[in-house]
């Protein structure tokens, strides 16, 4: 029978043989069972193999799918390039053929041509596009063309577009652009011809020229406006030629714009350089008087009144306002050069007048720049005009002609740059595109350029309004852009099409704008920039490269349009753009000083305007290529992650970020994520969690659940994982778990807005080590009731707001398992549930995974797998404003302080020994409790009884609920204070509302947990107590916090309390301690073995165990200073004194284990042994610690409230100047003084050099004087003798007493204190030894005097060093401290005035 029983399928195959081994059973049964077992084994093996194969095949399919998508994307790009190339080259060839096809007009007889092509033609919508095959021109099209034309001044043919009325439907702009470009060459020639022809036909003397004045505008949403500038729109007025001959720079000298009086004193603006654009911000429409001045003085200046039309659709996209078309008759001879101008005639021949060409080129560039404003395309052109054109040429036309143009072209681009520059004076969009022309020289006009920067509206380029194309859904591409983005593609995400030119000649990636959304309109400007007609465009790549100042810059400029103009001022980073195109190489944005930082980070930045969605499939993130963003429509989220080429951003599927929130997440590899959110917090919908994958740091500051973007760039990958308990094994090793009881979450959420929560993880995983996670407070824990979106993952950048509690502590975050934990605003949390976060390390990076724990009592988390280090943060009170501070020193300490702390009690427990602590009653005082954990146990119980049992079973002192003895588990007893310390180092402080902490890393369920998981060093302290208390966990130094050592060290959780302390809000609940988990080396054993022993690092036992054996005495510390630092501030007044006191407590180099912190070196040699990076890091960490301690002191002591806290940088500098940071050995090595050093030295030396000499001569003189002056009567000497005899008697008495009493032991004085005793005796003061202990005496007073003297001299010398630093040349260390430095130092320190003659009296005679 037993054999049969043994065949149960679920049995572990390893033990299957047991059935075979049973003796005395029927052999048949045994054989059959063995056979069954074998069959079963085979079956399972086969099944496993098949499953494995299936998995592999699925994976292969996924990979293939991914590659197909990639290939498809590449094909799309290729097709766009081919099409553009085709049209471009076709245009060139046709030009040479005589532009027949190029221009529909070419078929018309010259006699009727003039009527067909009259300038007004461009203004009529029908004809507008006459040159282009398609009849419908969309506004965007026109815009793009406009850009085109802007970019290619010479593309006259296409330029007319501007005149075209906008029609949103057009999707072809890009194609047209391409075409235009190509046509440029042809059209230019034609244009020249036409210009001449038309002139001839009209009259011998005059030529008719069409001038178009138009404007584009863009609505600035209220959230994008600057505080001091509430303009509703950004607009650009442009002056250009007709579509046939867009560039007017060969006959127009300058343009004056007369603006509305409200623009005074700048209501008259002169633009001298070719892109005749003016960009401004404003809130109303008004007639603009545009005065055009011609180069030939015979042509009188003309005034054109143009009514400015602003975007009434309020879409935030750039829209074409209105255009005013004017025909002007100019003296033919004044334009004689015109025909020559290659620009106007595309003919390559024109190259001959290179200078002029250059000019046109410049114009083109500027035009391009301009165009951007009008159209999305423009941005491209503008930013890239050179690049693009050049690119285009090289890429698209691979004709020699393009080469010819090169020189000019370059110029153009440069010019453009300038102009955009010029605009920078205004906030125009372009702000970032400062393309510095490298050699503008070629343009004849270049001199004007200098002026240009001021007026030019080029600026727009980068931000250019065009980037926001008018509502037309199509993206506009500059007309000239040869690259056709796929306009048709409507990708839900808008991709910003930026084309960045990697290599001079090629356009790297144009992202496709998606037609569907208006944003998508951004055209790829780069192409546009190529002027169609202008010879310049022809540059071929290489030359263009050289000429361009910086390719990147130009690219960059063009990119900006992507972003809505003002949209991203903050992100401006030189980093590689994470923007839509993975392709970009580097884009560097330069911001002009005056400009608003509109430019978003390199092109990508501006994405935020358009939401990008990423779909998340299954828990995987699908990488979204910028071009096709997949959006899951359901999400309201507007997160627009910037995606770096390879990065993926996952938006939690279920979570809908409220659309209001626009998070711009920049992703790039190791950076920080910054999300800029509008006030709304993202809500998680459904049980999804957002996990950040590769977050190195996420910093969120500012509470309210909003994540504030800081300039930092960060990148995070967010991954969505299902909320269910995560198997720790699944994704890679778990680095650390963060457990947050829901209520605590709420508590954390209550911290005042500025609070920052840092989690640092340390684990064996090298990759996991030392990651600092800053958990945005807002995100911190607003868990929605039924969704466990842990905002803890906030690190990831999502901030979850709890739907229920939204308020500060009001609703506790919901616990795991989806059960809402209810806590009334006033009351303590009724259920504490923990959500634990696990820091997981996966190939993609480390991230926090939220682990909900089921709420129902009795359930156990099965995932009791071991976590290497768990960081638990729990703050119990739903609304306490407690501040949690954890600082890691050499012993990392976890410190929470309640706002109203009474006194702090310090409990020291010896290493692994658990002692019942008699002191418990003291602990009960609502004071701050300081727990020092030496070996691995910490316990603090605010409540009266504390029981430790060595075996880990918890005895409840109050006895209300039995605690199961399994090691890791604790039962939560509501209201019972209980502390259980299992060897697994876990302690919970429980207050009236008890929180159960369990050692088991993952097992944290309020209910009793039977699973014993081993935690490798988890210290948790939860205090749910309503009385405020402070608990400090000190984790032994062995675990080195922050340091990256491979052996897991303790990570510290820093929650700066500073801000927190101030809000003493309603709740009284104390904050709970953050559990710090110490990741120790114990390998996480996934088996739920109850390993209670925590392995600590080898060095662990050392320092901590020393005196802690019996010191159960509870020390009360006066200040709840950060962890170990106890600083007495009664006698301190100034910030300098405070700083000195704090810095002395936090040394950078210390041999003593107690003072050592994670960043301190044991000796100067060790410190100098570090490389400069580590030294700087230690210096900075020390400064940060000092700043935190200092801030806490300032906040806690009302008398310091008037002092302003210092920044970390200032503290680091101060420490360096005052000698608290050893100077870098590198800087000490400079033996040869540089001339500036010598000069500085000469300047700073006093007139009379003081040379140092020994005191011998002086002493001799003084002795001689004494001899000479010894004239006093000798009876005084007798008196002296008398006085000496009396003390002798007293001494005798003492000796007798001693004989009567027990033996007394005197500790021998140190040489220093012996010296002090001698000196004091000489002046008639005897210092009595002080009883340290019964019959133990030591010379304490002498030691104290010695120490005080040391401090005094140290203060003087350090101040003198600081004075020396001021006089030394910058970044140099003073070689020596001179007498004058010391004198200055003494004068600088107020309490040293007894050393100066400041308050000395004078005899009247002297007066």
Swiss-Prot record:
Ranges for domain YEATS: 201-346
Subunit and partners: Component of the ADA2A-containing complex (ATAC), composed of KAT14, KAT2A, TADA2L, TADA3L, ZZ3, MBIP, WDR5, YEATS2, SGF29 and DR1.
Primary gene name: Yeats2
Function: Chromatin reader component of the ATAC complex, a complex with histone acetyltransferase activity on histones H3 and H4. YEATS2 specifically recognizes and binds histone H3 crotonylated at 'Lys-27' (H3K27cr). Crotonylation marks active promoters and enhancers and confers resistance to transcriptional repressors.
Listed Gly residues bias regions: 795-829
Residues bearing the modification Phosphothreonine: 406, 477, 1204
Cell location: Nucleus
Histone H3K27cr binding: annotated span: 260-262, 283-285
GO MF annotation: an example: TBP-class protein binding
Residue spans of biased composition, Basic and acidic residues class: 149-165
UniProt feature coiled coil, ranges: 54-80
Keywords attached to this entry: Coiled coil, Isopeptide bond, Nucleus, Phosphoprotein, Ubl conjugation
Crosslinked residue numbers (Glycyl lysine isopeptide (Lys-Gly) (interchain with G-Cter in SUMO1)): 1095
Pfam families: 3HBD, YEATS
Protein name per its UniProtKB record: YEATS domain-containing protein 2
Gene3D superfamilies, per the entry: YEATS domain
UniProt region (Disordered), positions on chain: 116-196, 462-540, 791-833
Comment block on domains: The YEATS domain specifically recognizes and binds crotonylated histones.
Composition-biased stretches (Polar residues): 119-148
Species name: Mus musculus
């Amino acid at each position: 029978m037993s054999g049969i029983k043994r065949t149960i399928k679920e049995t572990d195959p390893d033990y299957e043989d047991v059935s075979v081994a049973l003796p005395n059973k029927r052999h048949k049964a045994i054989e059959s069972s063995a056979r069954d077992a074998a069959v079963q084994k085979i079956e399972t093996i086969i099944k496993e193999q098949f499953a494995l194969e299936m998995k592999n095949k699925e994976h292969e399919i996924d990979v293939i799918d991914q590659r197909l998508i990639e290939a498809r994307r590449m094909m799309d790009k290729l097709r766009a390039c081919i099409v553009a190339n085709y049209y471009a080259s076709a245009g060139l060839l046709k030009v040479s053929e005589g532009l027949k096809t190029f221009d529909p007009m070419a078929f018309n007889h010259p006699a009727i041509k003039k009527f067909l092509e009259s300038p007004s033609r461009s203004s009529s919508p029908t004809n507008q596009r006459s040159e282009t095959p398609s009849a419908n021109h969309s506004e965007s099209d026109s815009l793009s063309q406009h850009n085109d034309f802007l970019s290619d001044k010479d593309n006259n043919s296409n330029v007319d577009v501007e005149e075209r009325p906008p029609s949103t439907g057009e999707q072809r702009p890009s194609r047209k652009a391409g075409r235009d470009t190509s046509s440029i060459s042809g059209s230019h020639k034609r244009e020249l011809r036409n210009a001449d022809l038309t002139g001839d036909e009209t009259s011998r003397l005059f030529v008719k020229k069409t001038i178009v004045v138009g404007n584009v505008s863009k609505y600035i949403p209220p959230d994008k406006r600057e505080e001091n500038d509430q303009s509703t729109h950004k607009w650009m007025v442009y002056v250009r030629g007709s579509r046939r001959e867009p560039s007017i720079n060969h006959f127009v000298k300058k343009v004056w714009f007369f603006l509305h009086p409200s623009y005074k004193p700048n209501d008259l603006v002169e633009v001298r350089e070719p892109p005749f654009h003016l960009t401004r911000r404003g809130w109303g429409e008004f007639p603009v008087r545009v005065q055009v001045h011609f180069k030939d003085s015979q042509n009188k200046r003309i005034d054109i009144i143009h009514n400015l039309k602003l975007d009434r659709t309020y879409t935030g996209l750039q829209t074409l306002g209105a255009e005013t078309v004017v025909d002007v008759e100019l003296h033919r001879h004044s334009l004689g050069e015109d025909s020559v101008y290659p620009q106007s005639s595309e003919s390559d021949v024109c190259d001959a007048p290179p200078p002029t060409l250059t000019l046109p080129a410049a114009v083109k560039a500027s035009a391009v720049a301009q165009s951007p404003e009008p159209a999305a395309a423009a941005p491209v052109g503008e930013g890239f005009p050179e690049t693009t054109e050049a690119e285009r040429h090289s890429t698209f036309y691979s004709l020699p002609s393009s080469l010819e143009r090169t020189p000019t072209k370059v110029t153009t681009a440069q010019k453009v740059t300038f102009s955009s520059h010029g605009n920078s004076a205004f906030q125009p969009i372009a702000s970032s595109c400062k393309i510095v022309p490298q050699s503008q020289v070629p343009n004849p006009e270049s001199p004007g350029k200098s002026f240009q920067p001021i007026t030019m509206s080029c600026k727009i380029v980068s931000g250019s309004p065009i980037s926001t194309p008018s509502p037309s859904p199509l993206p506009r591409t500059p007309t000239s852009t040869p690259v056709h983005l796929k306009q048709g593609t409507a990708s839900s995400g808008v991709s910003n099409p930026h084309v960045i030119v990697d290599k001079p000649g090629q356009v790297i990636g144009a992202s496709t704008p998606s037609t569907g959304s208006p944003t998508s309109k951004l055209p790829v400007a780069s192409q546009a920039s190529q002027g169609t007609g202008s010879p310049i465009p022809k540059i071929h790549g290489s030359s263009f490269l050289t000429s361009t100042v910086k390719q990147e810059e130009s690219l960059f400029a063009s990119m900006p349009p992507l972003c809505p103009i003002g949209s991203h001022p903050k992100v401006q980073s030189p980093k590689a753009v994470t923007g839509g195109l993975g392709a970009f190489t580097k884009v560097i944005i330069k911001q002009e000083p005056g400009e608003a930082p509109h430019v978003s980070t390199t092109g990508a930045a501006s994405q935020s305007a358009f939401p990008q969605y990423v779909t998340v499939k299954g828990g995987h993130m699908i990488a979204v290529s910028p071009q096709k963003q997949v959006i899951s429509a359901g999400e309201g989220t507007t997160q627009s992650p910037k995606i770096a080429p390879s990065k993926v951003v996952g938006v939690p599927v279920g979570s809908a970020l409220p659309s209001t929130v626009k998070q711009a997440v920049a992703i790039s590899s190791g950076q920080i994520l910054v999300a800029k959110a509008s006030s709304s917090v993202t809500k998680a919908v459904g049980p999804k969690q957002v996990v950040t994958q590769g977050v190195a740091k996420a910093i969120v500051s500012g509470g309210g659940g909003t994540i504030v973007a800081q300039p930092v760039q960060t990148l995070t990958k967010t991954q969505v994982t299902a909320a269910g308990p995560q198997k720790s094994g699944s994704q890679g090793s778990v680095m650390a778990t963060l457990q947050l009881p829901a209520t605590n979450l709420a508590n954390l959420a209550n911290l005042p807005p500025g609070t920052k929560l840092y989690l640092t993880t340390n684990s064996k995983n090298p990759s996991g080590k030392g990651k600092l996670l800053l958990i945005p407070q807002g995100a911190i824990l607003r868990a929605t009731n039924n969704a466990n979106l842990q905002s803890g993952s906030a690190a990831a950048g999502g901030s979850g707001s709890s739907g229920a509690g939204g308020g500060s502590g009001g609703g506790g975050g919901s616990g795991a398992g989806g059960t809402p934990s209810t806590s009334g605003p006033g009351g303590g949390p009724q259920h504490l549930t923990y959500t634990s976060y696990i820091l997981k390390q996966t190939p993609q990076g480390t991230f926090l995974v939220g682990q909900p724990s089921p709420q129902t009592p009795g359930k156990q988390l099965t995932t009791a797998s071991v976590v290497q280090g768990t960081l638990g943060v729990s703050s119990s009170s739903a609304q306490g404003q407690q501040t949690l501070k954890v600082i890691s020193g050499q012993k990392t300490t976890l410190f929470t302080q309640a706002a109203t702390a009474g006194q702090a009690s310090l409990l020291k427990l010896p290493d692994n020994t658990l002692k019942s602590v008699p002191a418990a009653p003291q602990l009960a005082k609502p004071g701050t409790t300081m727990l020092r954990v030496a070996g691995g146990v910490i316990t603090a119980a605010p409540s009266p009884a504390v029981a430790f049992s060595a075996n880990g079973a918890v005895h409840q002192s109050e006895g209300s609920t039995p605690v199961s003895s399994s090691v890791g588990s604790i039962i939560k007893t509501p209201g019972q204070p209980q502390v259980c310390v299992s060897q697994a180092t876990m302690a919970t402080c429980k207050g009236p509302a008890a929180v159960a902490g369990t050692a088991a890393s993952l097992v944290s369920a309020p209910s009793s947990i039977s699973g014993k998981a081993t935690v490798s060093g988890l210290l948790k302290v939860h205090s749910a107590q309503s009385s405020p208390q402070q608990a400090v966990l000190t984790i032994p130094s062995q675990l080195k916090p922050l340091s990256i050592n491979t052996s897991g060290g303790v990570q510290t959780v820093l929650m700066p309390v500073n801000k927190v302390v101030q809000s003493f809000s309603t709740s009284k609940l104390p904050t709970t301690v953050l559990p710090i988990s110490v990741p120790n080396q114990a390998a996480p054993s996934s088996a739920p073995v109850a390993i209670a022993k925590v392995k600590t690092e080898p060095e662990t036992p050392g320092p901590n165990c020393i005196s802690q054996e019996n010191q159960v005495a509870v020390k009360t510390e006066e200040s709840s200073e950060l962890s170990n630092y106890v600083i007495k501030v009664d006698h301190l007044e100034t910030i300098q004194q405070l700083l000195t006191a704090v810095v002395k407590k936090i040394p950078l180099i210390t041999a003593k284990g107690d003072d050592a912190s994670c960043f301190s070196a044991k000796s100067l040699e060790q410190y100098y042994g570090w490389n400069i990076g580590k030294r700087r890091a230690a210096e900075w960490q020390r400064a940060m610690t000092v700043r935190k301690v200092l801030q806490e002191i300032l906040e806690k002591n009302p008398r310091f409230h008037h002092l302003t806290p210092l920044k970390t940088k200032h503290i680091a500098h101060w420490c360096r100047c005052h000698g608290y940071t050893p100077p870098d050995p590198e800087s000490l090595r400079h033996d040869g003084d540089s001339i500036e050093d010598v000069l500085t030295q000469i300047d700073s030396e006093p007139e009379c050099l003081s040379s140092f000499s020994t005191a011998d001569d002086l002493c001799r003189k003084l002795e001689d004087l004494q001899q000479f002056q010894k004239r006093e009567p000798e009876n005084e000497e007798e008196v002296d003798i008398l006085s000496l005899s009396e003390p002798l008697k007293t001494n005798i008495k003492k000796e007798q007493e001693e004989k009567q009493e027990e033996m007394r032991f005197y500790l021998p004085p140190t040489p220093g204190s012996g010296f002090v005793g001698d000196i004091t005796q000489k002046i008639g003061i005897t210092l009595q030894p002080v009883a340290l202990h019964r019959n133990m005496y030591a010379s304490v007073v002498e030691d104290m005097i010695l120490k005080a003297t040391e401090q005094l001299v140290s203060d003087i010398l350090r101040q003198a060093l600081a004075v020396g630093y001021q006089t030394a040349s910058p970044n140099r260390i003073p070689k020596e401290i001179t007498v004058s430095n010391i004198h200055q130092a003494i004068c600088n320190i107020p309490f040293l005035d007894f050393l100066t003659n400041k308050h000395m009296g004078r005899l009247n005679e002297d007066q």
